[in-house]
Design a protein with these regions (language model features):
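N-terminal beta-strand motif that seeds the catalytic metal site of vicinal oxygen chelate
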Residues: 1-14, 64, 115-117
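Short glycine-enriched loop/turn motifs at secondary-structure junctions
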Residues: 1-2, 57-61, 92-93
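Short aromatic/hydrophobic contact patches that present stacked aromatics
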Residues: 5-7, 38, 63-65, 98-100
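Amphipathic alpha-helical segments
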Residues: 12-27
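Short, conserved charged micro-motifs
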Residues: 15-18, 72-76
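A short linear hydrophobic-aromatic micro-motif
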Residues: 26-27, 48, 85-90
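Conserved short beta-strand elements that form part of the metal-binding/catalytic scaffold
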Residues: 27-60, 108-114
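Vicinal oxygen chelate
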Residues: 78-79, 83-117
Length: 117
């Protein structure tokens, strides 16, 4: 069994599509109707965006994570995000390097690198 996709309820599909395309390289895979789109990330995973009213507090109940090869890549992402006006926190728990940002609906999204071996 393979985890195939995650669906987010968002207030504006267009704004969320632009965010995930710009910052994480996702491209449109399916766009069947207004208010719904499926984006594909380079490794094949899917992110479905469905327009609606996100549940109160739902943005803080989970996060999305994108792995990059090195901690330098995490720092580069953080610096690029900050240069474009996003708040980007950096953490280093247990040898990980993690940069966290929020999407247009406040969902937490992290870019991380595994601890060096």
């Amino acid at each position: 069994m393979i985890l195939n996709h995650v669906q987010l309820v968002v207030t504006d599909v267009g704004a969320s599509r632009a965010f995930y395309s710009r910052w994480f390289g996702l491209t449109e895979a399916v766009h069947e109707e207004a208010g719904f789109v499926i984006l594909r990330e380079p490794a094949g995973g899917l992110l479905a965006l469905h327009e609606g009213r996100p549940a109160p507090g739902g943005a803080d109940s989970f996060h999305l994570g994108f792995q990059v090869p090195t901690s330098r890549d995490v720092l580069d992402f953080r610096d690029r995000a900050r240069a474009h006006g996003l708040e980007a926190a950096l953490e280093r728990p247990g040898g990980f390097a993690i940069a966290r940002v929020r999407d247009p609906d406040g969902h937490a999204v992290e870019v991380y690198a595994m601890p060096a071996a």
